[in-house]
């Protein structure tokens, strides 16, 4: 796989699970002899929601919720066939969204 890069984008709501999955991918890729760029932390997307506390009166009384989406990017430069096989067999934690681009 000469001259090809693999870009892996990871998304999760919990940054601890995301960092653990990133470390797992990095250690697997290094063990198989590939070079890695990253992990690069991307900006955290924060979605905020404001709702009324009461169902019908007290418009001034509101409650705010937020949902944070943490993201990381990894680039694997010149992966070996063993690297691709190891990444395919890797079992990551639930709650981590993985996008792989060649």
UniProtKB/Swiss-Prot annotation:
Part of the 30S ribosomal subunit. HAMAP family: Ribosomal_uS10. The keyword Ribosomal protein applies. The keyword Amino-acid biosynthesis does not apply. GO terms for molecular function: structural constituent of ribosome; tRNA binding. One of its GO terms (biological process) is translation. Belongs to the universal ribosomal protein uS10 family. It holds the Pfam family Ribosomal_S10. This is Small ribosomal subunit protein uS10. GO terms for cellular component: ribonucleoprotein complex; ribosome. It comes from Methylobacterium radiotolerans (strain ATCC 27329 / DSM 1819 / JCM 2831 / NBRC 15690 / NCIMB 10815 / 0-1). The gene is rpsJ.
């Amino acid at each position: 796989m000469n001259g090809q890069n693999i870009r892996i984008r990871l998304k999760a709501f919990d940054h601890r699970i995301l960092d653990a999955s990133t470390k797992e991918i990095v250690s697997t890729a290094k063990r198989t002899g590939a070079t890695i760029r990253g992990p690069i932390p991307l900006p955290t997307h924060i979605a905020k929601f404001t709702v009324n506390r009461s169902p019908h009166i007290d418009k001034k009384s509101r409650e705010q919720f937020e949902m944070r989406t943490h993201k990381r990017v990894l680039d694997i430069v010149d992966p070996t066939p063993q690297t691709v096989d190891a990444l395919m067999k890797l079992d990551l934690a639930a709650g981590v969204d993985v996008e792989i681009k060649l």
